[in-house]
């Protein structure tokens, strides 16, 4: 099932499968989100929960039981309950149940996704609550994909990623298998812009740490058109696209947690987490994305 809201600038459609934004159009009717061509990448803007990235061996253990865990958790692949779709807001919820606890994660949780339109900005808030009697630890992040180029008159090299100040991000190495190697390096030093090319992501994503910038955006050079994500407060931000030529979309991904390392233990309790909630506690984060198109 899908729900749609709109204002004078934007029309947003969210699917209850994965609580995923599947369409965002501007006032001219132009589609701003990647439309999930399965030949390139079959998603639009998935939620990453209760972990980000991959797990060593694709599994983890709790109390001696092994659970299978695919990339980026399981919230993106499950049906969420639509709570509200009116005015400028869509709200959905995913609750743990017996099947989830038996097969995916043996802890109680409530994940609420709230989308709100505010002028040319989409605010997407993820709230995690622990209704159970045990500690809840989790990872979480965003993975929106934006159409590139903005129109048929432009090509890949007309675009660049920009920070709001010069940056020398620390790149956390997770190549070639998506697990952290323990190595890090500098790809760019004291740069405010990263030129987009068809080969930029030939070796997969760039996971950046140590950023001071409040925003990361994809800019069309010389026109003023841009999409900017507020990444303030996020310890990690990734940029990525599928290895298609020419580039069809770009992702800007603020994360509160990291993929597992190659040497991580199997025990879930020993994995690094975005947060660890005691019974009754809750936690939330918001990604605000502004579309100047």
Q: Language model features by range: what are they?
A:
Residues 11-66:
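Acidic-aromatic substrate-binding/catalytic surfaces of carbohydrate-active enzymes
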Residues 5, 96, 101-151:
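Acidic, contiguous internal or C-terminal segments within carbohydrate-active enzymes
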Residues 226-293:
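Active-site pocket scaffolds in enzymes
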Residues 1-8:
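Short, Gly/Pro- and small/polar-rich lid/capping loops
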Residues 66, 70-119:
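Extended, loop-rich substrate-binding clefts of extracytoplasmic carbohydrate-active enzymes
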Residues 14, 60-68, 126, 275-292:
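Short Pro-Gly-centered flexible turn/kink motifs
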Residues 83-90, 116-121, 150-153, 220-222, ...:
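A short, structured loop/turn motif at beta-sheet edges
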Residues 148, 152-232:
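Active-site/ligand-binding surface loops and adjacent short beta/alpha elements
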């Amino acid at each position: 099932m899908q729900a749609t809201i709109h204002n004078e600038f934007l029309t947003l459609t969210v699917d209850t499968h994965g609580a995923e934004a599947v369409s965002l159009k501007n006032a001219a009717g132009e589609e701003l989100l990647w439309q999930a061509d399965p030949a390139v990448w079959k998603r639009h803007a998935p939620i990453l929960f209760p972990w980000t990235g991959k797990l060593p061996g694709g599994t983890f253990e709790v109390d001696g039981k092994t659970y299978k865990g695919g990339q980026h958790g399981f919230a993106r692949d499950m049906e969420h309950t639509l709570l509200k779709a009116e005015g400028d807001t869509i709200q959905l919820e995913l609750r743990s149940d017996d099947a989830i606890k038996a097969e995916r994660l043996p802890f109680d949780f409530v994940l609420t996704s709230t989308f709100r339109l505010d002028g040319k900005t989409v605010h997407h808030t993820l709230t995690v609550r622990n209704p159970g009697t045990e500690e809840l630890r989790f990872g979480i992040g965003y993975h929106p994909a934006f159409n590139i180029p903005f129109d048929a008159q432009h090509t890949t090299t007309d675009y660049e990623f920009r920070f709001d100040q010069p940056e020398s991000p620390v790149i956390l190495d997770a190549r070639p298998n998506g697990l952290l190697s323990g190595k890090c390096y500098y790809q760019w030093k004291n740069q405010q812009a990263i030129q987009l090319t068809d080969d930029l992501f030939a070796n997969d994503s760039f996971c950046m740490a140590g950023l001071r910038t409040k925003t990361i955006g994809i800019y069309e050079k010389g026109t003023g058109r841009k999409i900017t994500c507020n990444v303030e407060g996020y310890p990690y931000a990734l940029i990525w696209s599928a290895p298609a030529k020419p580039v069809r979309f770009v992702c800007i991904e603020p994360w509160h947690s990291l993929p597992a390392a190659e040497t991580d233990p199997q025990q879930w309790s020993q994995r690094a987490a975005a947060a660890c909630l005691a019974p009754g506690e809750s936690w939330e984060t918001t990604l605000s994305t502004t579309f100047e198109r």
